[in-house]
A protein has these predicted regions:
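Hydrophobic core positions of the immunoglobulin-like beta-sandwich fold
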Residues: 100, 112, 144-148
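Short beta-strand elements bearing conserved aromatic residues within extracellular beta-rich modules
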Residues: 121-123
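Short beta-strand segments within Ig-like beta-sandwich modules, predominantly Fibronectin type-III
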Residues: 134-141
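Active-site-adjacent substrate-binding region
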Residues: 1-94
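Conserved aromatic anchor
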Residues: 106-118
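Edge beta-strands of extracellular beta-sandwich domains
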Residues: 166-177
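Beta-strand-rich modules
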Residues: 146-168
Length: 179
């Protein structure tokens, strides 16, 4: 989301695969230990230059060498990391408890613990088949009813919004709210 806002020329695209076929990535050890980790890469790799031992074969130079580093692109990747880290650093704390209700109802009810010093909150929801938060509603309250939204058809989450507009990470409901 932040990259789309601040660096739209990067045209980010999420690939929902843990890793590339037959190769590893720097993010994998983080994933293996339970941490979130993503791999940022050029989508159109040059296989004579990347992931090759340095050699010459049939008059073709193979190998990862300094002369093939695209420093303008590397600078942009560094900016992508900085944008996302800054956004997280400037964001408020996330709500600790998020309750969800709406079992056998035509509406979804959400309430959450107050986060001190925030401007408001954003309620997110998405289809169960979607990897991104496609819908949202802003509120300054700590409880909200999404009318006409059926609990079984979506995933839900809540983030805190700081005075500066930065949002915390989205928290999935972790408690049931019974009437």
């Amino acid at each position: 989301k932040n990259v789309n806002i601040y660096m739209p020329e990067m045209n980010p695209m999420m690939i929902y695969r843990l890793d590339r076929f037959g190769r590893g990535g720097h993010h994998r050890p983080f994933n293996d230990l339970g941490f979130a980790g993503i791999r940022i890469m050029e989508a159109h790799e040059n296989y004579t230059q990347q992931h090759q031992d340095i050699r010459i074969e049939n008059n073709i130079k193979y190998g990862d060498t300094f002369e093939h580093v695209n420093f303008k692109y590397a600078k942009k990747l560094t900016a992508v990391n900085a944008i996302n880290l800054a956004s997280l650093a400037w964001a408020p704390e996330a709500p600790k408890e998020v309750f969800i209700g709406g079992i056998v109802e035509a509406n979804v009810r959400l309430k959450w613990s107050e986060v001190k010093g925030v401007k408001g909150y954003k309620i997110y929801w998405r289809d169960t088949t979607s990897p991104t938060w496609d819908h949202s509603r802003y509120t300054e309250k700590t409880a909200f009813t999404l009318e006409g939204i059926v609990i079984d058809n979506f995933f839900f989450g809540v983030s805190a919004v700081g005075e500066n507009g930065h949002e915390s990470v989205v928290v999935f409901p972790n408690k049931i709210w019974r009437k």
